[in-house]
């Protein structure tokens, strides 16, 4: 089973459900106070997709957006935010460095932050964003009818997507939730390390992954509270094989039609294939020929140039 988010609102990823919704909520509150939303500036840090959602939401709400990106965000993802009217600021360093710069600038200029990660004292907006993400779970439950997945593989950066999916599924299925499996990059496995240590554990990212949306070294506080008791297993994967899986999706090898699967979308199938070829992991995950595995296709070709390079066309 594959939940395809490649066409969501024309923005190419699930992020369209969260950031834009949070911006709309902020703008509405601003207007209730008798203020002109044209004078509102929202700020965020991003690897690309979340910033695009915030930029789009700001454009729709008639406000401004200030987007902080790190050194390894592609030029194409930067351009996608700029054409929506965002003022994009590139910071040296990784995602955590861009988030620190965003926090500093927001405090100095009194800008509300629209972040999909949470920290001490900052929870309301990330909860709104996760509420937006929960639409995916409602759609999954509705489309599956009486059937339910035995395993769900969740790509994880800071954990907002995974938490937004798991919470409604837990409400619906409770004890029949099935196995919830996180997949991260080897370079930024903050959830795997945090679960292993029993507490949130920061990863100092030394090398960037091809799966840009997974390049986050610190778990979201709210996501941690939801995922710590609900994740059954954590996996981390290398970049090798991601391009090949994207090619297979594009060629229609996993169904009747071609699927536009971005780098992060390939991570779930990569994890499943690793398990399939490793009897020990297969047994640990309690997989068998009757398993019904749900993969989350988080994005399409959000960087069209890179996508074409990776699929070879």
Describe each region flagged by the PLM.
Residues 1-313:
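PLP-dependent amino-acid enzyme catalytic core
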């Amino acid at each position: 089973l594959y939940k395809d988010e490649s066409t969501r609102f024309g923005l190419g990823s699930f992020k369209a459900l969260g950031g834009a919704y949070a911006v709309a909520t902020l703008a509405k509150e601003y207007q209730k106070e008798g203020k002109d939303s044209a004078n509102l500036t929202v700020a965020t840090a991003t690897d690309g997709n979340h910033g695009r959602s915030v930029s789009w939401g700001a454009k729709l709400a008639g406000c401004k957006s200030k987007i902080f990106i790190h050194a390894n965000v592609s030029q194409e993802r930067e351009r996608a935010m700029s054409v929506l009217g965002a003022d994009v600021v590139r910071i040296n360093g990784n995602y955590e460095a861009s988030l620190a710069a965003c926090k500093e600038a927001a405090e100095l200029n009194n800008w509300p932050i629209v972040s999909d990660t949470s920290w001490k004292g900052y929870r309301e907006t990330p909860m709104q964003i996760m509420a937006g993400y929960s639409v995916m779970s409602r759609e999954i439950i509705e489309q599956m009818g009486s059937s339910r997945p035995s395993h769900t593989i969740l790509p994880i950066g800071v954990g907002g997507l995974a938490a937004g999916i798991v919470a409604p599924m837990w409400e619906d299925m409770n004890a029949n939730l099935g196995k919830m499996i996180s997949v991260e990059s080897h370079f930024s496995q903050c959830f795997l390390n945090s679960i292993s240590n029993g507490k949130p554990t920061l990863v100092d990212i030394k090398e960037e992954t091809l799966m840009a949306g997974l390049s986050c070294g610190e778990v979201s506080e709210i996501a941690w509270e939801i995922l710590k008791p609900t994740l059954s297993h954590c996996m981390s994967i290398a970049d090798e094989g991601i391009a090949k899986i994207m090619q297979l999706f594009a060629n229609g090898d996993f169904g009747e039609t071609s699927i536009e699967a971005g780098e992060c979308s390939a991570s779930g199938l990569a994890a499943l294939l690793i398990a399939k070829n490793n009897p020990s992991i297969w047994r640990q995950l309690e997989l068998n020929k009757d398993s019904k595995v749900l993969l989350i296709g988080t994005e399409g070709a959000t960087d069209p140039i890179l996508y074409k390079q990776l699929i070879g066309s």
